[in-house]
Amino acid sequence: MTVGRTAGGPECAEWSREIFPPKSSSSDTEPEDEQFGEGLVLPRAGKLHEFLSPEEDTDSTSDSTGSFYRTPQVPKQRGRWDVLESLFQSDPDSDLNDAEDEEDLESFFQDKSRGKPQVQDPPSLRHGSMRRCSSMTSLPSDIPKARILPTSDSGPPSQHRSVCSWASSITVPQPFRMTLREARKKAQWLASPASFEQERLQAQKQGEEEAECHRQFRAQPVPAHVYLPLYQEIMERREARRRAGIRKRKELLLSSLKPFSFLEKKEQQKEDAPQRDSAAVAQTKVSPKKATSRKIPKSILEPALGDKLQEAELLRKIRIQMRAMDTLRMASSPVSTARNRAPRTAARTQEEKLSFLQTEFEFQPKVNPVVPDYEGLYKAFQKRAAERRETRETTRNKPFLLRTANLSHTPRSCDAATAGGGKKSPQPTATPLPRSRSLSGLASFSANTLPVHITDATRKRESAVRMSLEKKDKSDMSIQWLEVHKKNCQAMSKSVTLRAKAMDPHKSLEEVFKAKLKENRSNDRKRAKEYKKELEEMKKRIQTRPYLFEQVTKALARKEAEERYRDALKQAGLEEEFVRTKSQGTEAV
C-alpha cells in the first residue's frame, strides 16, 4: 500500500514494491484500475481507497505563508466507519475480498501506538499531480508498473527521493474486527425499501412471464361467413325454390279442380262424333228415308188458343206468389214471452271485455257485384249541384214618372228667332218642348239620395259588422259587470267583517295585551313568593331536625325500652292488649 505517492521515478516505485508486495491471489479476481483526472489511479475492486485517502488540498493560492510542506491528516473515526459501512454495503456477498481486507487492515494498523511525525510536503506535489491512496493488494500482478505508476517529467528527482524518505513513517489506524462485523451485519439488516420493491417487481414480472409461457394458444374458429355461398348461388337457389313452389301449387290446384258438366258433355260428344258419323254414312248407304212433314202447332193456327195459354201461365205465376206469401206468413217465429229482456251482467261484461275474440259477427257485409258508373254519377251530381246553387238576383229597373212636363218654360231669343222664321217658311210650327231639369236636380243632391241597389254581399257584410259590434258591446258589458260585482263583493266583505267584530265578544290582541301582561307579571310574582316561602320552610325543617346519628340513637333507645317493657310484662304474666284496654278505661274514667 502506498500513501502520498506521486508519479515519480523508479526509486520510489522499487521502495513501495519492497514494502507492500502485491498478492497474486487477488490479482486474478480484481478488475483493472480506473484512472481519473491527471494521473490519479484508483483501484475499482479495492474497498479501502476512500478510507486511506487523506483530504486533498487544491487551493494553492490561499496559502499566504508560501510553505511547501504540510502534515498528513488522519481521517476521523466517524468518517472511517461510514466509509467502511458503504464499502460493505456495496458488495456484501464477496467473502474472499472481506477476508483479504481484514488482513490488509490488520497488517496496516499494527503500528497504531506510534506517533505521527510532521513531514513536510514539497510544493511540487501540490502543483504537479494530485495525491493518491491505493492498495497494492488490489492491483493485479500482470499489469505493468508503468501503467499503474505513470511517470511525470515535470517533477525533479529530488522530490521523489523526499517522498520515499517520509512515506515509511506514516501511521494509519486500523478498525477492530468487532466493528467490521457489526458494520457487515448492519449492512445486511438495513436493506433499503427500494431493494425490496425491486425484488417484488422482479418476482411479479417473472411470474407473469411464466404464466405467459404456460398459456396455451389455440387457433380461432373459422368465421361463419366463409361457409356462406356466393350471392349468385343464393339467388339461383331462391329462384329454383320459387319455381318448385309454383309447380307444386299448380299441381295441387289441378288435383282439387272439379270439371263442369258441359265439359264432360263436350268430351263425350267428341268421343261419340266418329261413331255418329259412321252411323250416318251407313244409313245413307242403306236406304234414304222419306221426308216427313212436321205438324203445325195449334197455337199458331188458332190465335185464341195462344191467349188461353198466356192466361194460364199468368195464373200459375200468381198462384206461386200467393203460395210463397202464405208459407212466409206461416213460417214466422212465435212471439217471445219476455221481450227486450236485458242480458245478464256476466254476459254484458263478457261482451264488453272479450269482444275482440268474437268470431261470429252480426254484421255481414254484402258485396255489390255491379260496378257503378262513376262518370254518369259525377255528371248527375254536377247537375244537381248546379240546380241547388243560389243564383244572384239581377238588378231590375223600375219605371218612374218625370214631372218635368208640368214645369213652366220661358221662351228664349233663339226660340223666338226660330218662331219668326217659321212664319215665313211653309213648314208647320212645332210645339215647344220644355227642358228637363231632372238630371241637374239629381246631380245637385248628395250621394246618399241616389237610388242604390243593395246586393247580398253588402247585406251579409253589414250583418257581420253588426254582429261583431254586438259581440264587442257584450264583452264590454261583461267586463263592466265584473268590475261592479267585484266592488260590491269588497264592500260586502268589509261590512261583514265590521259586523262580525261588533258581534264578537272576544277582544283583539292589542286591546288585551296590556291586561294579559299585568296578569302574567302578577302571577310570576306570586309564584316567586310561594317558592321563597317553601324554601324557608324547608330550611327551618332542616335546621330543627336532629342529626342522623341522633335519630339512630333515639330509635335504638326506643326499641330497647319497648323490649324491656315487653320483658317486664312477660315476667309479670300480662299481655299488651290487656294493659292497653285497662289504660284506656282509666283514661275514660
From Swiss-Prot:
Residues 510-577 form a coiled coil. It comes from the Eukaryota. InterPro entries: FAM161 (IPR051655), FAM161A/B (IPR019579). Residues 287-297 have a biased composition (Basic residues). The keyword Cell membrane does not apply. GO terms for cellular component: cytoplasmic microtubule. Residues 265-275, 386-396 have a biased composition (Basic and acidic residues). Transmembrane segments: none annotated. Residues 1-166, 265-297, 386-444 are annotated as: Disordered. Residues 92-106 have a biased composition (Acidic residues). Keywords: Coiled coil. Signal peptide: none annotated. Pfam families: FAM161A_B. PANTHER family: PROTEIN FAM-161, PROTEIN FAM161B. Belongs to the FAM161 family. Interacts with FAM161A. This is Protein FAM161B. The lineage of its organism: Eukaryota, Metazoa, Chordata, Craniata, Vertebrata.
